[in-house]
């Protein structure tokens, strides 16, 4: 069964190389760990050990991204690729751009859901969303989040 994770909108309040050619955007906070990062197998461990289950799929890796003016519709074209789970501002994302309060950041990824999951409930886990996200699957808005770690 083909699931198209059409777009995840991260509207940040404060706020391209191809996958095979991924590289950090600059040398900010360079570490041995970052130098050993494999963009084809990014942080493969289960993200929430307390909820670990046998059937799961890691969506870390290369996603399309676009930065648009706040309030614009979903983009038809994306500006490049971003390495998830790293923030767009970080070097390890491969982007290294800062988003301001007049902009929104869109992520897009297509993936296959294993046929054995047909008819089962599927949990999409986001390790962090910095302020606001609208989640779309197959052109259908399936959820939203507002908050983050702000007091």
Feature locations, PLM:
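N-terminal pre-domain segments of enzymes
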Residues: 21-57
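Generic detection of short hydrophobic beta-strand segments and adjacent strand-loop junctions
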Residues: 57, 82-86, 109-111, 145
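Bacterial Sec-dependent N-terminal signal peptides
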Residues: 1-22
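Accessory beta-strand-rich segments of carbohydrate-active enzymes
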Residues: 64-68, 97-151
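Extracellular/oxidizing-compartment recognition motifs
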Residues: 22, 27-30, 37-39, 88, ...
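Core domains of carbohydrate- and sulfate-ester-processing enzymes
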Residues: 59-104
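A short, polar/charged loop/turn motif at coil->beta-strand junctions and beta-hairpin connectors
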Residues: 23, 27-29, 53, 57-59, ...
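Generic structural signal for beta-strand residues in well-ordered domains
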Residues: 7, 13, 56, 75, ...
């Amino acid at each position: 069964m083909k699931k198209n994770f059409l777009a995840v909108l991260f509207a940040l309040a404060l706020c391209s190389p191809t996958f095979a050619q991924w590289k950090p955007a600059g040398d900010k906070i360079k570490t041995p760990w970052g130098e050993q990062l494999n963009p084809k197998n990014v942080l493969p461990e289960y993200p929430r050990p307390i909820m670990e289950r046998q059937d799961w799929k890691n969506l870390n890796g290369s996603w399309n991204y676009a930065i648009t003016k706040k309030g614009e519709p979903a983009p038809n074209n994306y500006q490049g690729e971003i390495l998830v789970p790293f923030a767009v501002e970080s070097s390890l994302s491969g982007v290294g751009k800062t988003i301001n309060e007049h902009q929104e950041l869109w992520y897009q990824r297509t993936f296959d859901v294993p046929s054995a999951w047909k008819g089962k409930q599927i949990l999409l886990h986001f390790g962090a969303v910095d302020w606001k996200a609208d989640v779309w699957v197959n052109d259908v808005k399936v959820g939203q989040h507002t908050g983050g770690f702000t007091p």
